[in-house]
Design a protein with these regions (language model features):
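Bacterial Sec-dependent N-terminal signal peptides
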Residues: 1-20
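Surface loop/turn signatures of beta-propeller and other carbohydrate-active proteins
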Residues: 19-48, 67-71, 87-113, 146-175, ...
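Extracellular glycan-recognition regions
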Residues: 21-22, 31-36, 268, 282-284, ...
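Entry beta-strands of beta-propeller and related beta-repeat scaffolds
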Residues: 55-58, 117-121, 179-183, 236-238, ...
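Short glycine/acidic-enriched loop and turn motifs that connect beta-strands
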Residues: 63-67, 125-129, 188-192, 244-246, ...
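Short, solvent-exposed loop/turn segments at conserved positions within beta-propeller repeat blades
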Residues: 70-76, 129-135, 192-198, 242-245, ...
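Conserved Ser/Thr-centered positions that define the repeating blades of beta-propeller domains
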Residues: 83, 140-142, 203-208, 252-253
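Extended catalytic-interface subdomain
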Residues: 239-242, 247-324
């Protein structure tokens, strides 16, 4: 869960009261999940995808005040949306909620099925007897992944020796071949001699009562490695985690490391926060994160917690590194292609219907499409010949006399980057052949 500046709102809650957000799942469209947010002044926080027997379960944090509920402690609860085909979705009311006054937030976690029982592990944010904020581990069980019952003691695990009590959250659960539960917990070390003390705690238990603290999966991180995800895919093990909201991953041929840095960090970009993934049919993996809101609704302002769901499909390269693409089921239907008015400069030669060549050795060459509808899906094919600094689009560029107007999308073969407005993906290889640029 990303730490972002926010204004605190204050609530008075009696000891017997439940914290409730005005979320009515029945009113949400079953046809919309890509870029979904709940109706009204509600938002999506960290996503927790899970796959079981043909159903993709997308648990997500229901955010009602950009993390500022309950004196800034979050007031988050787990909501759920499910699908068997990624096209039609069913939205459920809160499945793990705040039921007690001491529960200040039901934080991020993970789900596993063992012996036909769903186990949801999560952190509960609370105020301890000394008035300090702590994060402690809780879990709930369910026969169907929808109706959960919290288990006692709650919390069942308060802290690991040598690690932070304030930052002890986001447990990722896996069950090994012997039936042991493994939890990977976001925290920081108390003994680090530098400020790079972020660590991924590794807990193991057979009975969910006695827990052994194993060697941490990673240490020496600049920040708490949040919202971990972990899975095996075609002989590679992946550890995914967030730092400052952005998503990073490591890969290994061994279950718990040592880890190697991938050839590219395909999940690291500023417009999607803390991505996690789950299996899907036919060996696929579908990832989900959230697009952060911005202060005052302006993209050039800073991030605030909570936003819209974003879903992508992961692909695996020959070296085990990960890439992303659009899941075909989630690409929206469109009307037939339009033919907008074209305004071109002297560097442009029209080759045929919707086909152009730009020759601009001395600077920028461009042509414009006039009166493009506000909501459009834009795709194009391009072949780059010779050294080119960059190529791309200016989106929603309403004034050609102002270079800074609009959103600049650019691919740079020279710098090996792809950028959109204020976020950049690195290690981009542009082949010497026709490539297709698409969006969804």
């Amino acid at each position: 869960m990303k730490h972002i500046l926010f204004a605190c709102l204050f609530f008075s809650v009696s000891a017997s009261a439940q914290f409730k957000a005005d979320y009515n799942a029945a009113k949400e469209s079953p046809a919309i999940m890509q870029y979904f947010k709940p109706t009204g002044n509600l938002f999506v926080g960290d996503c927790i995808p899970f796959f079981h027997k043909g159903t993709y379960y997308l648990y997500w944090l229901l955010d009602s005040a950009h993390h500022s509920a309950l004196n800034g402690l979050g007031g988050h609860q787990w909501a759920l949306s499910t699908s068997t085909d990624l096209k039609t979705w069913k939205h459920y009311p809160v499945v793990i909620g705040i039921d007690e006054d001491w529960e200040k937030s039901i934080c991020t976690g993970s789900v596993v099925v063992k012996d036909n029982v769903f186990y949801a592990f999560y952190a509960t944010r609370l105020i301890d007897k000394d008035g300090k904020v702590n994060e402690q581990l809780s879990y709930a069980t369910s026969p169907d992944g929808i109706k959960f019952t919290k288990q006692k003691p709650n919390p069942f695990y308060t802290s690991a020796p040598g690690y932070s009590k304030r930052d002890f959250r986001d447990p990722k659960v896996v069950v090994d071949e012997t039936g042991n539960f493994h939890l990977f917990v976001s925290s920081s070390s108390d003994s680090s001699i530098t400020r790079a003390n972020g660590a991924m705690v590794h807990l193991v238990s057979k009975d969910l009562k006695q827990w052994v603290v194993e060697k941490p999966l990673i240490v020496g991180q600049d920040d708490v490695p949040e919202c971990p995800d972990y899975f095996e895919w075609n002989g590679w093990y992946y550890l995914i985690y967030g730092r400052g909201g952005n998503t990073f991953y490591l890969q290994s041929k061994n279950k718990y490391g040592p880890w190697q840095y991938p050839s590219s960090q395909a999940l690291d970009e500023d417009w999607t926060n803390v991505v996690k993934a789950a299996a899907f049919t036919n060996g696929r993996r579908i990832a989900a994160g959230w697009v952060p809101s911005k202060r005052d609704g302006k993209d050039n302002n800073g991030e605030i917690f909570g936003g819209n769901v974003v879903i992508r499909e992961l692909t695996q390269e020959k070296d085990g590194s990960l890439s992303t693409k659009f899941a075909s089921e989630l690409i929206p239907a469109t009307l037939p292609a339009i033919k907008p008015t074209i305004i071109a400069d002297k560097t442009v030669k029209e080759l045929g219907t919707a086909s152009f060549r730009i020759t601009s050795p001395d600077g920028l060459g461009a042509f414009y499409f006039d009166k493009v509808p506000l909501n459009s899906r834009i795709s194009f094919e391009v072949t780059v010949k010779g050294p080119v600094e960059d190529f791309g689009l200016l989106l929603r560029h309403t004034d050609r006399s102002r270079e800074g107007n609009g959103y600049r999308f650019a691919i740079s073969p020279e710098n090996h980057t792809a950028s959109l407005y204020n976020t950049t993906i690195k290690a981009v290889e542009v082949p010497d052949k026709k490539i297709r640029i698409d969006n969804s």
